[in-house]
Design a protein with these regions (language model features):
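Structural motif
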Residues: 2-14
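Short, flexible loop/turn segments at beta-strand junctions in immunoglobulin-like
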Residues: 40-44
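A short, solvent-exposed beta-strand micro-motif common in secreted/extracellular proteins
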Residues: 45-57
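C-terminal outer-membrane/trafficking sorting elements
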Residues: 222-266
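Short, acidic Ser/Thr/Gly-rich low-complexity loop/linker segments typical of extracellular
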Residues: 23-39
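A short, polar beta-strand/turn micro-motif
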Residues: 82-106, 129-224
C-alpha cells in the first residue's frame, strides 16, 4: 500500500484527492480524511506509478507528483502552500470583513481594526495585524484589489464587538434593531445603522451592541454631535484635547477641539 498525509504547515487538509496512475494500469484513488491521511491499496509490485495529490477547494497551490515503484508499503506525504486571497476595497476606503481562515495584514497596505468599545455614538477602533479565523474586522485601505495571505492561526481577540458573517449572510430582524448594526455610507459619512430587513453580506461583519442612538459613527470626529463654546464650564483644559485630525493639542491651541466625544470652539 501507499499511505501518507497532506498538510498545510501543521494543518491537516481534508478532502484532498490522492491518485496513483500508471501506464496500462487501473487508477487507484482516495480522499484524505479529517486528519489529512490517505491510504491506497491494491498497488501492484514492480510497477511504475505516478502519485498525485489535488486540492479541490482551489485554496492551495499544486504540488509536484511523486514516483512510486515498490513492492513494500510506502509512505508519501504532501506539503501544500496556500494561495493569497484578493480583498477588494471600494472608493469609500472602508470594508467590514471576515474570512474562514486567519489572515496576516502585516506588510500589506491594508489596516485591520476591531471594535472593543462604543463611546456614545461612535466606535473606538483597535488595530490588529493578525486576524483570527471568522473574526469580524473593519478594513481600511486605498480603493484597489489587495493581496492578503492566510496563516494557520492567530491569537484570539477578546472583547471584539464586530461579528463576522463567514458562513452566511446575516439579516437584522425587528427584534435585533438597536442591537445589531450594519456599516454603510450615508451623506458621505461611514456609520453603523440598525434597520430591520438590512442584510449583511457573507464574509462581512456587523456591530453587536445595544444602544438607543439612531446611528453609531465609525470615527470619533464624525460622531461628535454637541458643539459648544469654552467658558461654559464644560471644557476641561487640564485634560487631553484633540484637533479634528485626532492630534493632541495644548492649552494655547485655538480652534475646534475634541474632548470626551464632544466638540468645542476654543
Amino acid at each position: 500500500k501507499v499511505y501518507g498525509v497532506a498538510k498545510w504547515g501543521e494543518t491537516p487538509l481534508e478532502g484532498v484527492e490522492v491518485k496513483l496512475a500508471g501506464e496500462g494500469l487501473e487508477d487507484i484513488s482516495a480522499t484524505t480524511d479529517a486528519e489529512g491521511k490517505y491510504e491506497l491499496t491494491g498497488v501492484k509490485a514492480d510497477e511504475a506509478y505516478t502519485l498525485t495529490a489535488e486540492d479541490k477547494t482551489g485554496e492551495f497551490r499544486a504540488v509536484e507528483s511523486q514516483e512510486v515503484n515498490s513492492d513494500v508499503d510506502t509512505e508519501k506525504n504532501f506539503a501544500f502552500s496556500i494561495i493569497p486571497i484578493s480583498v477588494s476595497i471600494d472608493k469609500t476606503g472602508v470594508k467590514p470583513f471576515s474570512y474562514k481562515r486567519a489572515l496576516d495584514f502585516s506588510g500589506t497596505a491594508v489596516k485591520a481594526y476591531v471594535v472593543k468599545k462604543v463611546n456614545r455614538n461612535y466606535t473606538e477602533l483597535t488595530e490588529i495585524q493578525k486576524v483570527p479565523a471568522g473574526c469580524g474586522v473593519i478594513l481600511k485601505a486605498d480603493a484597489d484589489e489587495h493581496s492578503v495571505t492566510p496563516v494557520e492561526k492567530a491569537d484570539a481577540v477578546e472583547g471584539n464587538l464586530l461579528v463576522g458573517t463567514v458562513d452566511k449572510e446575516f439579516t437584522i430582524e425587528a427584534a435585533s434593531v438597536g442591537k445589531a448594526w450594519s456599516l454603510k455610507k450615508n451623506d458621505g459619512i461611514m456609520q453603523f445603522m440598525s434597520e430591520a430587513g438590512t442584510k449583511v453580506a457573507k464574509n462581512s461583519a456587523y456591530l453587536a451592541y445595544e444602544s438607543t442612538e439612531s446611528v453609531i459613527y465609525l470615527n470619533q470626529t464624525d460622531g461628535i454631535r454637541v458643539i459648544t463654546t469654552s467658558g461654559n464650564g464644560m471644557l476641561d483644559e487640564s485634560k487631553p484635547m484633540y484637533n479634528l485630525a485626532g492630534q493632541m493639542v495644548g492649552k494655547d491651541y485655538k480652534g475646534v477641539v475634541i474632548q470626551n466625544g464632544k466638540k468645542y470652539n476654543k
